[in-house]
């Protein structure tokens, strides 16, 4: 695992956690300049998903422990804020719930918070990885490639969203993602599903803000209310992580929930 730091260390710290199978630069590169105006910004690059090291993603809890140790060693055990994109929301939830470090503001970025028993997680992983791994590494089959190309060329709002979302996933970036192993992807996908983040999380001194993408459906709102005792639900009439695709608006909303003045 690597953690990349940007900006003035005297400013409040915010740590960003990428989504499933995402590369840190394509996931968050477009928001770093805006964040650095207000925050000492740190971006997590998970084991097995960083191009500067030869490593394997073992499990979600293994990565959480590494992050906890980093925060203890480098940041006196405290973060002002943490943002979790999709999968990253599970990391933020675990870090808060385990209480080995303290986070003032935990921000959940329209995470699906899917949970499954280990047997089902393994089954879903066995189904998904043969399709998803070639897609991420740029070796997708003709059929899968055509499906995504069709969705991105429909000429409507959904196709524009899909195009931008694919950029966050690294598609079209020109980056060779062959450094990501199938084992890392499998372990990340499976352990995220079968690692419980807990229920009704309520930690003194911590506020949990949820960027709820309304177009995902009401069942996700119910999941957030089950996971967190008293979440600050920030509702947007958007799709999964669509807010993050608009860098200026996203930075504005992050600052707003953290009580920091930022003008669009």
Identify the function of each model-found stretch:
Residues 82-84, 109:
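Short beta-strand immediately N-terminal to the catalytic nucleophile in serine-hydrolase-like folds
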Residues 229-264:
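Catalytic active-site module of serine/aspartate enzymes centered on a nucleophile-bearing elbow/loop
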Residues 97, 105-137:
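Flexible "cap/lid" loop of the alpha/beta hydrolase fold
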Residues 179-223:
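Conserved serine/cysteine hydrolase catalytic core
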Residues 42-81:
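Active-site loop/oxyanion-hole signature of alpha/beta-hydrolase fold enzymes
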Residues 84-92:
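Gly/Ala-rich beta-loop-alpha elbow adjacent to hydrolase catalytic centers
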Residues 4-53:
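Conserved HGGG/HGGXW glycine-rich cap/lid loop of the alpha/beta-hydrolase fold
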Residues 33, 207-241:
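Conserved loop-alpha-helix segment in the C-terminal half of the alpha/beta-hydrolase fold
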